[in-house]
UniProtKB/Swiss-Prot annotation:
Entries under InterPro entries matching the protein: K+_transporter (IPR003855), K_trans_C (IPR053952), K_trans_N (IPR053951), Kup (IPR023051)
Transmembrane segments: 11-31, 51-71, 100-120, 138-158, 167-187, 202-222, 246-266, 288-308, 334-354, 364-384, 396-416, 418-438
Entry membrane topology: Multi-pass membrane protein
Protein name: Probable potassium transport system protein Kup
GO cellular component: membrane; plasma membrane
GO MF term list: potassium ion transmembrane transporter activity; symporter activity
Similarity remark: Belongs to the HAK/KUP transporter (TC 2.A.72) family.
Gene this protein is translated from: kup
Length: 620
């Protein structure tokens, strides 16, 4: 039992460096924005205790109960994430709800990208702004320094972060201990802030401000940004270590710091705007700024890695066109680099920093995408609870009312900042949603067109009855589906008048599981004397590789010798069939994405000297 405990403890330690980076750096700006934003709340005991009570119960209800106890129950072989939750809902829900679950998953993915643009800018700026607290003369240099850090962060992505990644957990452990120490020291001088643990203070605050509470709740949301990382990174560490890290260290440290900032406001007659950095003695200020900068870089890295992982998931689910994906580690499958996503995210982050220029201005843009994702996760959770877990309606309705009601309130509160910057992540999210929706819809249409063509069995029977010249070796034809005759096969017969001794119709089927066991990788059926049908199963966290595929086929008895196997692919050129402006625009956009998508031969790592590509035209 002891080794198991050590393993769980070490995973909990590592989880601090990845999972809790975003939510762990929220004390830098969340509390400050309530009392020192463009629309500050008056500093008095009722307001301070009310806000602290709201933060505490947000941690309990949203993070601890909703995510760590409920949402994380919905997993596929231990993997989590919003697309996983959407996939589980689609598997079990009635047909009308399946498409809704798919669209909700795509929409949440778009909002995650919108949030990912704000997070690095907000986190790094809020840390570097500590320089202006230590040395006010350096205030004009805050933005350039923050931008230099962001440029360096995105520049190293191509090299991978495996070497420096080992320092993430120790740095974040030190960060959380410092948070706790600073907060506890301040609470010692004003222990009355601990009364905010009583929910009566939150209720009193809401009753006191009435409808104006919505505006203030939008700032309280900043304390739980990054909560979706708990679910998304579940596959890397397991839910038990993530829960241990939260309840044993992360949550107590964050609450101590927030309550310490509240104590600071109540004990000083003229508190300054930077409530976090003001907790530290002057001698600690520069080391604290340096530590905060490291912590925000780690938080930003976790978000960037999350975007790479989500992009790969979306590609394998068929929601995004194939892109180049590079593996940056020989030891970890999760260490990947997606150049296109990296460049788009970098440009967007730099634009946001230049547009908003400070964490105070960015606070208005931060939060609305987070609450939108929370709302979607609650809607999907209700579907999963009813149809996957088979919960009875009274239980489902209860969690629906509690969490959808709570998320609706938070979404409404962040919507009050829509015109001050909240439009930006929503706009980015909607753009990503439209791209994914058009790609998925038109790709599905192509599969339907292919399925309506000549049947595979009839075609094979016809070919076996004909007397074609036979070429030596094996020809592999890639097919969209089992019922689809590859265009490359038809063109080879039409123009070359030849067949190979062995012909393999190969289909790649992406499964709603993170990884497929090697024993289940290949399904092989010999359908005639010289034809085989092969289905290759790929998980959404995997990258297809033809060398591995050939090895798996060999294990099942179909030997594909590299020097005797030829791969014949059809390179489609799509044409628009004029049916109306909206239809034509969608098809045109799909065609443009197809032109710039990663070629099948490149994605599968097919050797160029064993490849023949044939151009074909298809009308949509």
């Amino acid at each position: 039992m002891k080794p198991a405990k050590q393993t769980t403890a070490s995973l909990a330690f590592l989880a601090m460096g990845i999972v809790y980076g975003d939510i762990g750096t929220s004390p830098l700006y969340a509390f400050k924005e309530v009392f020192f934003s463009h629309h500050p709340l008056a500093i008095n005991p009722d307001n301070v205790l009310g806000i602290l009570s709201l933060v505490f119960w947000a941690f309990v209800l949203i993070v601890s109960i909703k995510y760590l106890l409920l949402v994380t129950r919905a997993d596929q072989n231990g993997e989590g994430g919003i697309l996983t939750l959407s996939a589980i809902a689609q598997q079990s829900a009635p047909k009308p709800w399946q498409r809704i679950a798919m669209l909700l998953g795509i929409l949440a993915t778009g909002f995650f990208f919108g949030e990912a643009v704000i997070t690095p800018a907000m986190s790094v700026l809020s840390a570097v702004e500590g320089i202006a607290v230590a040395q006010p003369d350096l205030a004009p240099y805050v933005l350039p320094i923050a931008m230099m850090i962001i440029v360096a962060l995105f520049a190293v992505q191509a090299m991978g972060t495996e070497r420096i990644g080992r320092f993430f957990a120790p740095v974040m452990l030190l960060w959380f201990l410092v948070l706790a120490l600073l907060g506890a020291h301040a609470i010692w001088h004003a222990p009355q802030v601990l009364r905010a643990l009583n929910p009566a203070y939150a209720v009193h605050f809401v009753l006191l401000y009435g409808q104006h509470t919505l505006f203030i709740l939008g700032l309280v949301v900043l304390s739980v940004t990054g909560v979706e990382a708990l679910y998304a990174d579940m596959g890397h560490f397991g839910i038990k270590p993530i829960r241990i890290a939260w309840f044993a260290l992360v949550m107590p440290s964050l609450l101590l710091n927030y309550f310490g900032q509240g104590a600071y406001l109540l004990t000083l007659s003229a508190p300054t705007g930077s409530t976090f950095f003001s907790l530290a003695p002057k001698a600690w200020l520069w080391p604290l700024i340096l530590l905060a900068t490291f912590a925000t870089v780690i938080a930003s890295q976790a978000v960037i890695s999350g975007i790479f992982s989500l992009a790969r998931q979306a590609i394998n689910y068929g929601y995004l066109p194939p892109m180049k994906i590079a593996h940056t580690s020989e030891h970890s499958q999760g260490q990947i680099y997606v150049p296109a996503a990296n460049m788009l995210l970098f440009v967007a982050v730099i634009f946001v920093m230049l547009r908003f220029r400070s964490s105070a201005n960015l606070a208005a843009a931060y939060g609305i995408a987070v609450t939108a994702i929370m709302m979607i996760s609650s809607l999907l959770l209700v579907l999963v609870a009813r149809y996957q877990w088979q919960w009875r309606w009274p239980r489902v309705v209860t969690i629906g009312i509690v969490f959808i009601g709570m998320d609706s309130l938070l979404l409404a509160s962040t919507s009050t900042k829509l015109m001050e910057g909240g439009w930006l992540p929503l706009l980015l999210g909607c753009v990503v949603f439209i791209v994914m929706y058009i790609w998925q819809q038109q790709r599905q249409r192509l599969l339907e067109i292919a399925g309506n063509e000549l049947s595979v069995s009839a075609m094979i029977q016809s070919l076996e009855e004909e007397s074609f010249q036979r070429a030596a070796g094996t020809a592999v034809y890639l097919s969209r589906s089992l019922n689809h005759v590859p265009r490359s096969l038809l063109h080879n017969i039409k123009y070359n008048k030849t067949l190979h001794e062995r012909n393999v119709l190969m289909t790649f089927q992406y499964e709603a599981v993170p990884r497929v066991h090697p024993c289940r990788r290949a399904e092989i059926e010999q359908v005639s004397a010289s034809f085989w049908q092969v289905v290759i199963h790929i998980g959404y966290q995997e990258e297809p590789d033809m060398a591995q595929v050939m090895h798996c086929c060999g294990l099942k008895g179909l030997y594909l010798h590299p020097n005797e196997t030829l791969f014949l692919l059809s390179s489609e050129r799509l044409k628009v069939q004029k049916l109306g402006m909206w239809h034509d625009l969608k098809v045109w956009f799909f065609i443009q994405m197809s032109k710039h998508a990663l070629r099948t031969s490149e994605r599968l790592n097919i050797p160029p000297d064993r490849l023949i590509e044939m151009g074909v035209y298809r009308e949509m």
